[in-house]
Amino acid sequence: MRHPEHQYLDLLAQVLEKGDQRIDRTGVGTRALFGAMIRFDLSDGRVPILTTKRVYWKTAVKEMLWFLTGQTNIQALLKENVRIWSDWPLARYRKETGDSISQEDFEKRVVEDNAFATRWGDLGPVYGKQWRRWLGADGREYDQIAELVQTLKSNPASRRMLFHAWNPPELGAMALPPCHMVYQYHVTSSGKLNCILYQRSCDLLLGAAFNYAAASALQLMLAQQADLTPGEFIWFGGDVHLYLNHLDQAREQISRAPRPFPTMRLTRRPDSIDGYRISDFEVDGYEPHAAIKADVAV
């Protein structure tokens, strides 16, 4: 049986060979395809943490747990040594103040100075805000995650089990509009929880691996809370691209042979979706190839 990671490697190769090349918002330039799908089966306990390069899965899961808190300030992430969101507020700070502060010093100030963090560490109404506190036209805040969990428990045959973060009136205030936009869930008659993730924009070299790991972790949490078992994770990409400064790294990754996916399990069951901690996740059998370094386009 062909290793499921080959779906990802094949997509890398397709973008390299057939992608439409153009200059993008960041100025770096991309090679892109429009429309892609990958399916992973989580029912045997194995999760798609890519093996053809080391993926720092704890960072991805910590980010997902942060989203679930509804927070939008990077201070909490930095206290967990998660630095993947620092580029955007740092760029804003440098632009607005003219200060050429280093990223290390900027992050240190965000962690240690609450007033500075409040002024410069907030990302605007990004994922967590929309997932947990979507502001309706009636002035009420809607908790999409709580509604999803309740529906999974009370009406698992529903076709309305989804949440998303694309809130047009608030897009302009976000540091970055949502890339992984829509999560939809489906429960089979045998009690398996399936997930579709639609991602409008996918940085295929850097972003996709995190999205696969984080979405799988969320699927495990939701399944546990609703007394279900994980089923399929199905990923759809809209604009699937490689930045032009990532092409050599993509070729290196394609040259590597996949190794067995690791297993992920939850070591305890919290009372609610809000109770999970990074220590609740145990990954076994992860023996990837070496990490591949690449710069983030801001």
UniProtKB/Swiss-Prot annotation:
Key word Ion transport present: no
EC annotation from Swiss-Prot or TrEMBL: 2.1.1.45
InterPro entries the UniProt entry points to: Thymidate_synth/dCMP_Mease (IPR045097), Thymidate_synth/dCMP_Mease_dom (IPR023451), Thymidate_synth/dCMP_Mease_sf (IPR036926), Thymidylate_synthase (IPR000398), Thymidylate_synthase_AS (IPR020940)
Pathway in which this enzyme or protein is active: Pyrimidine metabolism; dTTP biosynthesis
Stored PROSITE patterns: THYMIDYLATE_SYNTHASE
Protein's cellular compartments: Cytoplasm
UniProt key word Methyltransferase: yes
Alphabetically ordered keywords of this record: Cytoplasm, Methyltransferase, Nucleotide biosynthesis, Transferase
GO biological process: dTMP biosynthetic process; dTTP biosynthetic process; methylation
Reactions performed catalytically: dUMP + (6R)-5,10-methylene-5,6,7,8-tetrahydrofolate = 7,8-dihydrofolate + dTMP
SUPFAM superfamilies the UniProt entry points to: Thymidylate synthase/dCMP hydroxymethylase
Active site annotation, chain numbering: C179 (nucleophile)
Broad class of enzyme this protein falls into: transferase
Record: residues binding (6R)-5,10-methylene-5,6,7,8-tetrahydrofolate: D203, A297
PANTHER family for this protein: THYMIDYLATE SYNTHASE 1
Protein known as: Thymidylate synthase
Gene encoding the protein: thyA
